């Protein structure tokens, strides 16, 4: 019997373009040096990591149906597939320079994510001996919501996964702590590499 998989709470998100991947042979996903190379990049291979995200929620995933009643045989509905998943997060007390940078990612085509959980794992897609980001669509980063003295100020971030996104989903346990050992996006805003790497001209 196979042991159950604990996906855990998503605590940070790494954004990159689809096509950037880790390979067991050349740049293992479990090694900090492999990630450091992607984080240091100044071109379309760059990866950037958010600070902590909170209140992760997922909606959707229900079946798409047609018919029922007199429209279909025996009144039984037809299942046409599944709805996409919409995931949302609260970005609490973020400097708005980071929010502004995340909004630039809304313009980038073919974007994907690696999700870092509370158990030190990396949630991603596996194809043979390669590990790839999960493709996302419809990234949205909202403006600041001031909450006064009642609760922390926050921005909202949302994106969608396509149907069947989780068919090849795995949790990888690396030899380092993704949430603690990988530099956040603000470092790459400050050194100028974010602006170089996430220039929409790469995607035209």
Describe the role of every protein-language-model region.
Residues 1-88, 132-154:
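Solvent-exposed edge beta-strands and adjacent loop segments
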Residues 16, 40-41, 50-52, 90-92, ...:
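A structural detector for beta-sheet-dominated domains
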Residues 25-28, 44, 63, 75, ...:
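Short linear motifs in intrinsically disordered/low-complexity regions
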Residues 54, 94-96, 120, 141, ...:
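Generic "edge-of-domain/loop-turn" microfeature
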Residues 87, 111, 157:
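Residue-level detector of short, conserved catalytic/binding motifs and their immediate flanks
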Residues 90-131:
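Short, acidic/charged, Gly/Pro-enriched secondary-structure junctions
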Residues 133-200:
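Mixed-charge, glycine-accented linear interaction segment located at domain edges/termini
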């Amino acid at each position: 019997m196979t042991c159950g998989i604990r996906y855990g709470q998503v605590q940070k998100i790494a954004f990159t373009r689809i096509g950037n991947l880790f390979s067991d042979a050349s740049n293992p996903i479990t090694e900090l040096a492999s990630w450091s190379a992607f984080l240091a990049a100044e071109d379309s291979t760059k990866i950037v990591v958010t600070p902590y995200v909170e209140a992760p929620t997922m909606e959707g995933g229900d079946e798409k149906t047609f018919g029922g009643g007199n429209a279909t045989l025996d009144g039984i509905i037809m299942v046409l597939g599944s709805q996409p998943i919409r995931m949302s997060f609260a970005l609490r007390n973020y400097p708005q320079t980071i929010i502004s940078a995340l909004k630039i990612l809304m313009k980038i085509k073919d974007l994907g994510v690696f999700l870092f959980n509370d158990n030190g794992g990396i949630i991603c897609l596996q194809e043979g001996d390669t590990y790839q980001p999960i493709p996302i669509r419809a990234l949205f980063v909202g403006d600041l919501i001031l909450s006064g003295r009642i609760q922390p100020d926050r921005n909202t971030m949302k994106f969608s996964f396509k149907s069947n996104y989780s068919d090849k989903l795995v949790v990888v346990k690396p030899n380092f702590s993704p949430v603690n050992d990988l530099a956040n996006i603000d470092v790459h805003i400050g050194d100028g590499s974010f602006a170089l790497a996430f220039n929409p001209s790469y995607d035209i």
